[in-house]
Amino acid sequence: MNQTNLDFLATSDPALAAIIDRELQRQRTHIELIASENFTSAAVMAAQGSVLTNKYAEGLPGKRYYGGCEFVDQAETLAISRVKELFGAAHANVQPHSGAQANFAVFLTLLQPGDTIMGMDLSHGGHLTHGSPVNVSGKWFEVAHYGVEKETGRLDYDKIRQQALEVKPKLLICGYSAYPRQIEFDKFRAIADEVGAYLMADIAHIAGLVASGHHPSPLPYCDVVTTTTHKTLRGPRGGLIMTNNEELGKKFDKSVFPGTQGGPLEHVITAKAVAFGEALKPEFKVYSGQVIANAQAMADQLQKRGFDLVSGGTDNHLMLVDLRSIAMTGKVGDQLLGEINITANKNTVPFDPESPFVTSGLRLGSPAMTTRGMQEDEFRTIANIIADRLLSPEDEGVKADCLRRVSELCAGFPLYDHLRIPVAVIA
């Protein structure tokens, strides 16, 4: 029998092997609704755990500072060509270690300390790296934040335009971590042109939907597009920069290395190449469409059970549930769902009176459980389980019944059946 990496780990470090086994069991037995999480394929994990982890390769393919890079050059070149085809981009850099690193490289290219950036407020669904005061982006640059409308939970592009005319940002940022509606990139382009700003789209959450044609692409409109490679794209954890401007692309390359990073993680880049190849297949388009259908089914059922959703629903993979109508905080809701093996995350809602550590909302997403094969009926069932638990938080009988239903759902949609950690060794 051929030994696997997990066999070696169980022999050499049984304590860590046991931890990994417990995490595997958690993933198998829990309903995963964190919108930024997904389950990668076995092929992605195999690439990331390969011998490419041993290779240093500062620079770009064909222009390395180390010898012996001929094969990692091939892998990285394949990742670049695949992602360019996937998104229709003229230029791509696959080296950023994360979405935040990709954003920092863009800032280094386009901005000087003290320049003004304009992005969505974190409490309205933006991201830390879009100018939050606790992040480097909020410390190095002047920041103007826009948000959604209180009545609709949606962007008002006329108001964003008026704000941009007043503050005249050098960089206008669109793309969010908790906005459940489609983004109109053409309207942002018009605003950026009017004020003379660069336009950046951070599509970390919707990248898979964009790649599969289920969300409009920002590339025809934006000077630069950044993203993570996990979430809806279902690859390894990492970042990516794309542009249709070749001259800017060369500058972004220099801002990644040597500007913000040293050696690239070639094992992760190879895993990205695997994921990009998977996303180019017809099955991925079907998957992405199902992600949206499942999110909408869950959102509709939650509304039927009396829950308020920010903006009244969703166009993508996520939704924000405002728990103020049932006098519950996001922190409590998160804990209650955790007790029945549903993993979600507390999240601020627009105009939230609670602190970010408490919040008034829950963010729920469909990508991970869609990967496990669940469809609309299962997501309506999940919505009912959530409603039953949150509407009867003190009822131990309801809690036990919810836990049973979660267990049955997970058992019907197995995860990583091929993975085996030799428990005899780690016991």
Swiss-Prot record:
Keywords: Amino-acid biosynthesis, Cytoplasm, One-carbon metabolism, Pyridoxal phosphate, Transferase. It catalyses: (6R)-5,10-methylene-5,6,7,8-tetrahydrofolate + glycine + H2O = (6S)-5,6,7,8-tetrahydrofolate + L-serine. Pfam families: SHMT (PF00464). The modification N6-(pyridoxal phosphate)lysine is found at K231. GO terms for cellular component: cytoplasm; cytosol. The keyword Zinc does not apply. It is found in: Cytoplasm. Gene3D superfamilies: Aspartate Aminotransferase, domain 1, Type I PLP-dependent aspartate aminotransferase-like (Major domain). GO terms for molecular function: glycine hydroxymethyltransferase activity; pyridoxal phosphate binding. The record marks H230 as: Plays an important role in substrate specificity. Its EC number is 2.1.2.1. Pathway: One-carbon metabolism; tetrahydrofolate interconversion; Amino-acid biosynthesis; glycine biosynthesis; glycine from L-serine: step 1/1. (6S)-5,6,7,8-tetrahydrofolate binds at L122, G126, H127, L128, E247, S355, P356, F357. It comes from the Bacteria. Its cofactor is pyridoxal 5'-phosphate. Belongs to the SHMT family. NCBIfam families: PRK00011.1 (NF000586). Catalyzes the reversible interconversion of serine and glycine with tetrahydrofolate (THF) serving as the one-carbon carrier. This reaction serves as the major source of one-carbon groups required for the biosynthesis of purines, thymidylate, methionine, and other important biomolecules. Also exhibits THF-independent aldolase activity toward beta-hydroxyamino acids, producing glycine and aldehydes, via a retro-aldol mechanism. HAMAP family: SHMT. This is Serine hydroxymethyltransferase. It comes from Synechocystis sp. (strain ATCC 27184 / PCC 6803 / Kazusa).
